[in-house]
Amino acid sequence: MSLYNTHTGEWLRTVYWADGHYIREAVRDINWILRDHDSDEIRPMNAGVLDLLGMLRDRLDTRDPFLVVCGYRSPTTNRRLYLEGVGVAKHSYHIKGMAVDLRSEGRSIEQIRDAALGLRGGGVGYYPHSGFVHVDCGPVRQWRGSVRA
């Protein structure tokens, strides 16, 4: 897995799964990269979303890092953004550690969206005006958003 946090400038390249097990140190590092960048609050990310990112990377046939716009979002941050009318869901999967908003330098957001839809691993939100795709490990569904980052 290769991740770059667009807000903090931090990046990580790691193997988080080997020999049928998650690698604790790698998962800890992923949780750090995907933390709420406003509060530095960390929540363990759901294994389903980590696996979804891995499958998405494989489907896109790329080793380029995912550029993370948003991973975990604390309830406090989510509420503030919701009240500001930024366009976040009141009960966002980001709060549960089950969602990541991302893009990639090596693939278009349309390619990412199409690959994510093909996986049928959860929700896929396409935000062309903001330049990212939302993926989560919740129920399979799709939407087009209009949020500007």
Predicted regions and their residues:
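Short, solvent-exposed loop/turn and secondary-structure capping segments
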Residues: 14-15, 80-82, 114
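Short acidic/His/Gly/Ser-rich catalytic and metal-binding motifs that mark active-site loops
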Residues: 23-25, 77-80
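Active-site acidic/histidine clusters and adjacent loop/turn architecture
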Residues: 18-69
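C-terminal segment of N-terminal export signals and the immediately downstream linker at the start
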Residues: 1-14
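Loop/turn elements at helix/coil->beta-strand transitions in domains of secreted/extracellular proteins
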Residues: 10, 62-66, 120-123
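Acidic helix-start/capping segments at beta-turn-to-alpha-helix junctions
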Residues: 65-79
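Catalytic cores and adjacent binding grooves of peptidoglycan-active enzymes
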Residues: 4, 84-149
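Cysteine-centered nucleophilic/redox motifs
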Residues: 52-57, 74-77, 102
